[in-house]
């Protein structure tokens, strides 16, 4: 099983319910294919550096998960088919990136407490 991180941007005109529904759809897809969710973060509505689909902002979300590599093809196809997704990027994490992500999560947890 490989370790991956996906960041995706949802259309800013969506309601809070639609955003939660969309995030849940992708999370359910991963878990149904045997993925283990390591971390899930909602970064909220953020202004983008440049316009995408004539929009200046979007709802950012991050998933960190472990899954067999062949599942990613179907996962990314789901992103491409969903009109609510403006952009997405999936990267494979090496051991250094995994340790950095763990430190970042610990730091976020400490600031929230």
Swiss-Prot record:
Specify the domain of life of the species encoding this protein: Bacteria
Its Gene Ontology cellular component terms are:
cytoplasm; ribonucleoprotein complex; ribosome
The alphabetized list of GO BP terms reads: translation
Q: Does the keyword Flavoprotein apply?
A: no
Q: Name one GO molecular function term.
A: structural constituent of ribosome
Keywords (alphabetical) are: Ribonucleoprotein, Ribosomal protein, RNA-binding, rRNA-binding
Pfam families documented for this protein:
Ribosomal_S6
Its function?
Binds together with bS18 to 16S ribosomal RNA.
Q: Which HAMAP family match?
A: Ribosomal_bS6
* Family statement drawn from the similarity comment of this UniProt entry: Belongs to the bacterial ribosomal protein bS6 family.
What name does this protein carry? Small ribosomal subunit protein bS6
């Amino acid at each position: 099983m490989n370790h991956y991180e996906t960041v995706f941007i949802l259309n800013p005109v969506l309601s809070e319910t639609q955003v939660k529904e969309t995030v849940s759809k992708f999370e359910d897809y991963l878990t149904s294919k045997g993925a283990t969710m390591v971390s899930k973060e909602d970064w909220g509505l953020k202004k983008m550096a440049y316009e995408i689909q004539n929009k200046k902002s979007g709802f950012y979300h991050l998933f960190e998960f472990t899954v067999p590599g062949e599942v990613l093809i179907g996962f990314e196809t789901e992103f491409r088919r969903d009109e609510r997704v403006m952009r997405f990027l999936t990267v494979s994490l090496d051991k250094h990136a995994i340790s950095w992500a763990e430190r970042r999560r610990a730091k976020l947890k400490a600031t929230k407490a």
